[in-house]
């Protein structure tokens, strides 16, 4: 059996240590300066529930000027999440309803039921959840700072 030379093992250990620091360093720095919380994509993340509805949990995460909003049901199931910055939205591929999130950049077909509720709103973002058949939800995320009626056509009322 052939063994690695001692210097080969030390080099491998140093590379592994540097890789670990590269991954963990930004996350620890974000938590130290108050920019990040843990748990995006988790059922019960380490973040405050900011939902305006008693029927939903909404968690907001901020990192590098980008706001991430996650919507969970009362059982902690992740339904959808998206990133928002300066009126631009990107739906994240997490949650059972991720394919049913409408944004100004990605409008969805009109749902059968349009009677939803606002589950989150701040100075930039508003989120409406609308129940549909078979326990699926449609969600609409819009920019609350939009003033152009044509550009804001997917706006939640």
Spans of model-derived segments:
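Mid-chain, structured segments of secreted extracytoplasmic proteins
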Residues: 73-121
């Amino acid at each position: 059996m052939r063994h690695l030379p001692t210097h080969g093992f030390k080099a491998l250990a140093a590379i592994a240590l540097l890789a670990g620091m590269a991954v963990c360093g930004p996350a620890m720095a974000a938590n130290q300066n108050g920019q990040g919380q843990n748990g995006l994509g988790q059922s019960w993340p380490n973040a405050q529930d900011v939902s305006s509805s008693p029927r939903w949990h909404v968690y907001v995460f901020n990192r590098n000027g980008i706001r991430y909003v996650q919507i969970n049901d009362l059982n902690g199931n992740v339904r959808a999440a998206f990133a928002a910055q300066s009126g631009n939205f990107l739906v994240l591929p997490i949650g059972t309803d991720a394919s049913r999130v409408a944004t100004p950049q990605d409008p969805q077909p009109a749902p059968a039921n349009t009677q939803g509720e606002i589950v989150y709103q701040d100075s930039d973002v508003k989120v409406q959840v609308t129940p549909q058949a078979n326990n699926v939800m449609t969600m609409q995320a819009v920019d609350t700072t939009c003033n152009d009626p044509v550009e804001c056509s997917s706006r939640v009322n």
